Amino acid sequence: MSAIVNHLPSEHPKVNFGKVGVLLVNLGTPDGTDYTSMRRYLREFLSDKRVIEWSRLFWYPILYGIVLNTRPGKVGKAYAEIWNNDLNESYLRTYTRNQAEKMAVSLTDMPNVVVDWAMRYGQPSIKSRMDALQKAGCEKILLFPLYPQYAAATTATVNDEAFKALLKMRWQPALRTVPQYSDDPVYIDALANSIEAHLASLDWEPELVLTSFHGIPKSYFMKGDPYHCQCYKTGRLLRERLGWPKEKLMVTFQSRFGPEEWLQPYTDKTVEKLAKDGVKRIAVINPGFVSDCLETLEEIAGEAGEIFHHAGGEKFSHIPCLNDSPDGMRVLENVVRRELQGWV
């Protein structure tokens, strides 16, 4: 490298090169729980055509006339209940940053690899971190959307945004995207370990465990989105790894939004029905979420637990996401090392 630099003309701008970037990307987070921060975040999120596939002529009047005037306050209150007050940020941001920092440490045997992190919506943006990696000398970037199961509304929109960032670059790094890893044995083992460890910490045994995945509209599935199948495959492999009968572990879908039908069974309706049918003890895990966030901490640990208890259930426990735990990092590192093959 020094020989190449020595042959550059004196007036040549400084050029960094020879590095490989790894960019971890999660969904996103507001900068704060106030109305303005929430509205800015929701506007970016809900304006994405991958998330809401309705006609803009139909959707924008609803978004700007109703949703962005009513939802920021409600969602802000929900975020405030699970906010990381010590760092004044969402736990999703905390965990994603921790994952990137720990990943960098675990890859010290690859000195030319630079690890960074970004959010699809909010800050730090994908473009800002890709620009930073390129300026740091990364001629190749491994883009890692932190979603074990592929969906157009999650993985694809991260890829879209990354390729959009390339449009602004004169010297474009080579870009490689990480595929889904819903059936990765290391991932399945980590989920099984987390379930077994959590249940061992309880003084009661759940009658069944729900694996609650984020839902998508049924219409997206009918158009060819593989997400539904990959969620069920993860659930099946996890149940087999645990050695449980079919009735012990159930796949459900949460977080539906709007009037159309989403993937079923719905998590909230399921926990209510289970309680009314006489089930007294359940636990819920969120295999599709790499990190705990609003949808796991508030919607499941909070709301779903309340629904279960109000309907007659007695014991409810939420199993934390893998986050930046040793098992969680082992999963991410395994994927990164595999996808970096041929580059480092």
Curated annotation (Swiss-Prot):
Keywords for this protein: Cytoplasm, Heme biosynthesis, Iron, Lyase, Metal-binding, Porphyrin biosynthesis
Binding site for Fe cation: 214, 295
InterPro entries registered for this protein in UniProt: Ferrochelatase, Ferrochelatase_C, Ferrochelatase_N
Superkingdom per UniProt: Bacteria
Cystine residue pairs: none
Function: Catalyzes the ferrous insertion into protoporphyrin IX.
UniProt protein name: Ferrochelatase
Origin species: Allorhizobium ampelinum (strain ATCC BAA-846 / DSM 112012 / S4)
Gene: hemH
